[in-house]
Amino acid sequence: MPRPIQAVIHGPALANNLQIARRHAPNSRVWAVVKANAYGHGIERVYEGLRQTDGFGLLDLDEAVRLRQLGWQGPVLLLEGFFKPEDLAIVEQYRLTTTVHCEEQLRMLELARLKGPTSVQLKINTGMSRLGFAPAAYRAAWERARAISGVGTIVHMTHFSDADGPRGIEHQLAAFERATQGLPGEASLSNSAATLWHPKAHRDWVRPGVIMYGASPTGVAADIDGTGLMPAMSLKSELIAIQDLQPGATIGYGSRFTVEHPMRIGVVACGYADGYPRHAPGWDGNHTPVLVDGVRTHIVGRVSMDMITVDLAGVPEARVGTPVTLWGEGLPIDDVAQASGTVGYELMCALAPRVPVLVEPVGTAEAGDLGKAA
């Protein structure tokens, strides 16, 4: 028998989350962002759940080709564009939309002699200060892009740095408006946070990422309460051993947790080699949450490579084989991430290849029914 750990990708949740994004931006088209192998969920695994999107946004040419091989005929956006001149042959072959964010990319386009209309999203740096033309240089870049014979539609694009925080988007929105004033073309500005909370920035296209997977842009699960978003991934396992410990016993490497009263603990088949955060605390009053048989408890001691230990005080009926949820249905991934000093994005992307993954089909009536292996 294999280890009992598995991840479940919830197709119905993905489809639900796409509809939530549409309800928040009803007059916009949606780029469902599937970069980083769909935030660790797997492009092939999320495709059915997200295929009602208007387009997919991603980074790698390989990921774009995989989408085409799955049968996707709609728009595919390269969020960082192309990296070498030879990439443009693939852009044309697979009818990809490319971001253009710097002088070097613009020059490669001018020299490429593109055959057919290639759609471009021209990026403005309005304050994120990673990618994009400076606002003062944007109009000239747009004029050059428009003059390239193989360039088709040009969409104005930027990315918000503080849509999930108190500074907000006003300063960047104003810079965007100044840079694009009088220029024709559609606009794409909104990430997940702006899609949820800044309707004035929705424009023609929104680009939701982490909310597609049911997590919060702020990293705080409570901030998306009431939205209807659902977790797209559950990491599940079982208890593989139980220990009854007396005061003075210590738990795990480094003996970080010392038992102060008679205590029953469970050993879970999950560790940092599975993608669980090694730095998740389980001592000194700082405890990372976990569900045992649906009851919220917490880890005790250090996370090991293959195991974690959990407090069973609130689960007296627990035994070997009792189900455990590390995150997902009933336990927001953001709660685990926040306790561990990181964000849900990182935990999603860190799911280890050795963890078996099951896909719950989109048509499944009840969450938790397992579908095909993937």
Curated annotation (Swiss-Prot):
Q: Does the keyword Isomerase apply?
A: yes
A Pfam family: Ala_racemase_N
Q: Which domain of life is it from?
A: Bacteria
Q: Which GO terms describe its biological process?
A: D-alanine biosynthetic process
Q: Which residues carry this modification: N6-(pyridoxal phosphate)lysine?
A: K35
Instruction: Kindly give the Gene3D superfamilies that the UniProt entry links to this protein.
Output: Alanine racemase (3.20.20.10), Lyase, Ornithine Decarboxylase, Chain A, domain 1 (2.40.37.10)
| Catalysed reactions listed for this entry | L-alanine = D-alanine
State the needed cofactors, names only: pyridoxal 5'-phosphate
Enzyme Commission designation? 5.1.1.1
Catalytic residues in the record: K35 (proton acceptor), Y253 (proton acceptor)
Which InterPro entries does the annotation name? Ala_racemase (IPR000821), Ala_racemase/Decarboxylase_C (IPR009006), Ala_racemase_C (IPR011079), Ala_racemase_N (IPR001608), Ala_racemase_pyridoxalP-BS (IPR020622), PLP-binding_barrel (IPR029066)
Keyword Isomerase carried by entry: yes
* Metabolic or biological pathway, per its Swiss-Prot or TrEMBL entry: Amino-acid biosynthesis; D-alanine biosynthesis; D-alanine from L-alanine: step 1/1
Return one GO MF term: pyridoxal phosphate binding
Q: Where does substrate bind?
A: R130, M305
List, alphabetically, the GO terms of the cellular component aspect. Answer: cytosol
Record key words, sorted: Isomerase, Pyridoxal phosphate
The record's PANTHER family line, in alphabetical order, gives:
ALANINE RACEMASE, ALANINE RACEMASE, CATABOLIC-RELATED
What family, per the record? Belongs to the alanine racemase family.
Q: What does this protein do?
A: Catalyzes the interconversion of L-alanine and D-alanine. May also act on other amino acids.
Stored HAMAP family: Ala_racemase
Q: What is this protein called?
A: Alanine racemase
Organism, by scientific name, is: Ralstonia pickettii (strain 12J)
Q: Which gene encodes it?
A: alr
